[in-house]
Amino acid sequence: MLKAVILIGGPQKGTRFRPLSFEVPKPLFPVAGVPMVQHHIEACSKVPNLKEILLIGFYQPNEALNSFLLKAQQEFKVAIRYLQEYSALGTGGGIYHFRDQILSGGPQAFFVMNADVCSEFPLVSMLDFHKQHGGSQSYVILGTTANRTQSLNYGCIVANRDTQEVLHYVEKPGTFVSDIINCGIYLFSPSIFQHIAEVFQQNQQELQLEENSSWQRMEVIRLEQDVFSTLAGRGKLYVYKTEGCWSQIKSAGSAIYASRLYLSQYGTTHPERLASTKEGGPTIRGNVYIHPTANVDPSAVLGPNVSIGMGVTVAAGVRIRESIILHGAVLQDHSCVLNTIVGWDSMVGRWARVEGTPSDPNPNDPYSKIDSETLFRDGKLTPSITILGCNVSIPAEVVILNSIVLPHKELSRSFKNQIIL
Ligand code: GTP
């Protein structure tokens, strides 16, 4: 029997995802038409004998999360539970705190996945690899190759070329260490908890020496820095390298990039989710997802890489490219939306142009992963995608370029390179 844990973080996390994470917990933000973590859950549901998925985070349980989990449970026919940490315990502290729940029923192994990654989730291949590399006494990290500069933003892995044993692990190194990076997807045998316990005991000893140390601080454990770094070179930690697509979803810009990856996967995994040009329907270019309840005028042109949410209205002559349009939004006649996320219930007026600058990886470099982009560099706003928060209104005939508009704003003129509060 197997299980899976998805680390979903909490409200103080995902700051680079604002203002979109004000409205919906980031793990539920739609990527290629479905909530970000649904992609993880679906991948888990295809692993034979995977009996339970545990989401661990520090969000207060809420209506959106509960109803999503209920629906996903029914759709994917797997037990799913949310376990709430009393505060942020780190990527290792949460699983250690809930170790009894994870181990109940006696799983032979369990996956742990960061919620904010986009992947093909080669979980079955990871299982096979795990069996061939130590089984019950070993742990597997999914790795991929990045270019030298970008590797510095990730956990870097030095591995034995023949055995794939992890010899050295450094999280976000200051100088180049390795081009193999940690994808935030792991397969652990239950014995991993002995190693996390060592870190916990060490924290306890160190903190006992300090006055006013709290129980909570002892429980904060980072899998990457505290556990992987010490396990490396001890014949227990292995890297399974994937050639499949992978990216992180840190900023809103990277959500558009991740949408593109998932939409292209739909070609093989979910062709029914991809729209096509049909008699009497809009013109579709490349991969486009349209929610069945959306109302799209036949003269609109959509794509590539467009996701249209529930109840969205796309009027006559509208052009949309490389964008995510969230539920309830209205794009009026002849408006143009490029490299933008249009927030829930927002309105783009007639002939308005809303445009951002993509923050894609270098298209000529296959090993270039999307970076955690910075909004400001040298005190200046760097060109980014445009984001309209929830319930924003853009008047007719204006241009909004590389800007972020906070929720509930009614604009009256054009803006360029601004955060509109
Ligand atoms: P940054 O670039 O600083 O964001 O680092 P990172 O990519 O290593 O990400 P981080 O470790 O912050 O988060 C990785 C994943 O774990 C994300 O999906 C987070 O939501 C989740 N996560 C981070 N901290 C916690 C925590 O304290 N508890 C839980 N349950 N999840 C967490």
From Swiss-Prot:
Pfam families found in the cross-reference section: GMPPB_C, NTP_transferase
Pathway listed: Nucleotide-sugar biosynthesis; GDP-alpha-D-mannose biosynthesis; GDP-alpha-D-mannose from alpha-D-mannose 1-phosphate (GTP route): step 1/1
Cysteine-cysteine disulfides: none
EC number: 2.7.7.13
Keywords from the UniProt entry: GTP-binding, Nucleotide-binding, Nucleotidyltransferase, Transferase
One of the GO BP terms on file: GDP-mannose biosynthetic process
Protein name: Mannose-1-phosphate guanyltransferase alpha-A
Organism: Xenopus laevis
